[in-house]
């Protein structure tokens, strides 16, 4: 006896016979002939090697083995119904996993989207990885995540990006610095100052150094810092100047000021990036659609640049 050869169709016929206690009614409901139903029950009994139903005076009675099989079938079909519901939720983005890797600065912004999304989709897991651009780029190249957040997306054939938020970079100085009181500040005024910068590989540092090089300037005095918070605190303590995303600055910190450097514009944007050569999870697709529809409700409207429709359309 090998029960592995029992088909779901055989079990479906058997369950209907048990429920209706009628061969003819089973045939009608399942669109079969009565001889076919009888044949299926006979085949099932031969496979189990036990009588499952008995006919007495044209009435069907269920044996002990038949009742035990019926209970087992209920459990099995119930589990498959649950699995079908699970698949529907998975395909609808209600379950599953959306792995996101983001550059350091984006951690100040993305939770404002992730929080409302998670409240609407509590069964979606949202594991996050945070690093500098070089680290997130390495993860992208290895295909370790579903969605990547860059301020400068990779220029690769299998990379598809959608811009969603402006990321203005600003110069900050101690509140009592000589330049703090100047209404006109230029690159020439600041290049001789000590600058507190993130490590090489940081997108902010890359953009700043590229702007300097294009103008023929080189910084002579720099101090490497491990985080944007460290730069902000160090600038406020008088250690030097810094270049950071405006989004990392708390609104009521009076230990530093922003310098309006006239002859340089360090404008950038944040992008959601996916790999087109990899399957994107249903949860990731759900999150990107949520972001497209809710950017202005979740983030500061003045910085929103919602270009996610093309990205989402390309994923359909």
Predicted regions and their residues:
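C-terminal effector-binding regulatory domain of bacterial HTH transcription factors
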Residues: 1-5, 120, 246-253, 264-316
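Beta-alpha-beta core module
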Residues: 156-163, 167, 229-277
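Alpha-helical linker/hinge and terminal dimerization helices associated
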Residues: 47-48, 69-91
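N-terminal winged-helix
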Residues: 34-35, 39, 85, 91-121, ...
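A short LG(V/I)-centered, amphipathic sequence patch enriched
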Residues: 45-64
């Amino acid at each position: 006896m090998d029960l592995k050869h029992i088909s779901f169709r055989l079990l479906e016929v058997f369950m209907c016979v048990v429920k209706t206690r009628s061969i003819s009614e089973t045939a009608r409901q399942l669109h079969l002939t009565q001889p076919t139903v009888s044949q299926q029950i006979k085949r099932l009994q031969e496979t189990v090697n036990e009588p499952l139903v008995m006919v007495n005076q044209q009435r069907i009675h269920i044996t002990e083995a038949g009742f035990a099989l019926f209970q087992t079938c209920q459990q099995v079909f119930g589990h498959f119904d649950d699995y079908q519901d699970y698949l529907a939720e998975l395909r609808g983005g209600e379950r599953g996993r959306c792995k996101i890797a983001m550059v350091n600065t984006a951690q100040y912004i993305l939770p404002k989207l992730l929080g409302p999304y998670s409240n609407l989709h509590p069964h979606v897991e949202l594991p996050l990885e945070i690093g500098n651009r070089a680290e997130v780029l390495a993860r992208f190249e290895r295909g370790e995540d579903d969605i990547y957040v860059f301020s400068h997306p990779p220029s690769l054939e299998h990379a598809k990006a959608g811009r969603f938020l402006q990321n203005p970079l600003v110069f900050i100085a101690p509140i009592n610095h000589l330049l703090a009181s100047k209404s006109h500040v230029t690159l020439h005024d600041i290049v001789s100052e000590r600058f507190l910068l993130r490590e090489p590989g940081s997108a902010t540092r890359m953009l700043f150094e590229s702007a300097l090089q294009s103008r023929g300037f080189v910084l002579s005095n720099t101090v490497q810092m491990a985080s944007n918070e460290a730069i902000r605190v160090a600038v406020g303590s008088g250690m030097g100047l810094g270049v950071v995303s405006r989004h990392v600055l708390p609104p009521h910190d009076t230990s530093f000021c922003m310098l309006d450097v006239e002859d340089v514009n360090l404008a950038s944007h944040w992008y959601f990036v996916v790999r087109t050569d990899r399957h994107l999870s249903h949860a990731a697709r759900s999150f990107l659609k949520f972001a497209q529809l809710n950017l202005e409700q979740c983030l500061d409207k003045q910085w929103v640049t919602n270009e996610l429709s093309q990205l989402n359309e390309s994923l359909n």
